[in-house]
């Protein structure tokens, strides 16, 4: 979410043909483009406008992370009524504030850690230490800026996976750092939790996910789906509960 920062264009009837509500933007991207580059060629042809969502009973303050199978990733944010595009060399995003602020914060944190030794990664100097001290000094709270820092450094130090399964496991371990459980985030009587997590293998077109009520990892193989149908297919991610495997009989 991009609360307190999202600023959409005002809706005007003469611009109706190229206007999208915030929740329509993702569908537009996925159905019209096959790469980030082709999206960026047409990004200025549409406007994301201010629309009240009657279901959520609010305007949806969104920003967007877009990546393709080549690894090209960008963040798109509605600021002052304009869609601003930021190249995303880290391939990560959290909630507000703006992406450029988050990147400035990462650079500031790198300097403050005063590393004993460093590696260069994605053009950035990343501290490497032993005995678990490499991330000493990173904030551990669940705020979006802190989560951004934690994920940036966790991703920078992950051993390069050799298989799809290894990559998904590495992603799970990275996100485990800041899964928000009930009671950790309460605002105005509303309890905030990490409702679901998704892990996409864009090379093999696999979409894995788990939810707050079902931590069993589930997979959707997009190679087996026909995307030219006219019916929207749905699945309740909380329909089943976590599978706990009984290995008692396997003990020896």
Task: Describe each model-derived feature in a short phrase.
Residues 1-2, 65, 75, 199:
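Structural recognition of the beta-strand scaffold that forms the well-ordered cores
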Residues 1-33:
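N-terminal accessory/precursor segments of enzymes
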Residues 6, 68-70, 80, 202:
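Short, flexible loop/turn elements at secondary-structure junctions
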Residues 6-8, 81-83, 213-217:
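Short, surface-exposed beta-strand-loop junctions and turns on beta-sheet-rich folds
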Residues 10-11, 74-77, 84-88, 209:
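Short helix/loop capping segments that flank catalytic or ligand/cofactor-binding pockets
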Residues 21-52, 164-171:
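Proteins synthesized as precursors that undergo proteolytic processing into mature forms
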Residues 35-36, 40-77:
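Aromatic- and glycine-enriched pocket-lining scaffold segments that form the walls
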Residues 51-52, 59-60, 69, 91-252:
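C-terminus-biased signal that marks the final domain/tail of proteins
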């Amino acid at each position: 979410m991009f609360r307190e920062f999202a600023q959409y264009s005002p809706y005007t009837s003469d611009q109706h043909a190229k206007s999208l509500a915030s929740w329509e933007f993702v569908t537009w991207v996925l159905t019209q483009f096959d790469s980030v580059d082709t999206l960026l060629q047409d990004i200025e042809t549409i406007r994301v406008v201010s629309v009240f969502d009657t279901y959520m009973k609010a305007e949806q303050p969104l920003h967007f992370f877009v990546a393709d199978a080549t690894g090209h990733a960008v963040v798109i944010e509605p600021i002052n009524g304009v869609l601003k595009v930021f190249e995303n060399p880290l391939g990560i995003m959290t909630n507000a504030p703006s992406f450029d602020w988050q990147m400035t914060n990462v650079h500031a944190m790198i300097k403050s850690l005063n590393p004993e030794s460093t590696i260069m990664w994605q053009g950035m100097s990343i501290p490497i230490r032993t005995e678990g001290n490499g991330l000493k000094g990173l904030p551990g709270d669940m705020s979006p800026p802190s989560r951004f820092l934690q994920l940036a450094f966790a991703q920078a130090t992950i051993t390069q996976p050799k298989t799809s399964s290894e990559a998904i496991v590495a992603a799970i371990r990275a996100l485990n750092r800041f899964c928000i459980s009930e009671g950790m985030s309460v605002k105005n009587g509303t309890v905030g939790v990490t409702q679901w997590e998704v892990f996409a293998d864009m090379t093999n077109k696999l979409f894995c996910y788990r939810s707050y009520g079902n931590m069993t990892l589930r997979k959707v193989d997009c190679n087996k789906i026909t995307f030219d149908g006219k019916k929207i297919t749905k699945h309740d991610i909380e329909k089943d509960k976590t599978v706990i495997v009984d290995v008692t009989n396997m003990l020896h």
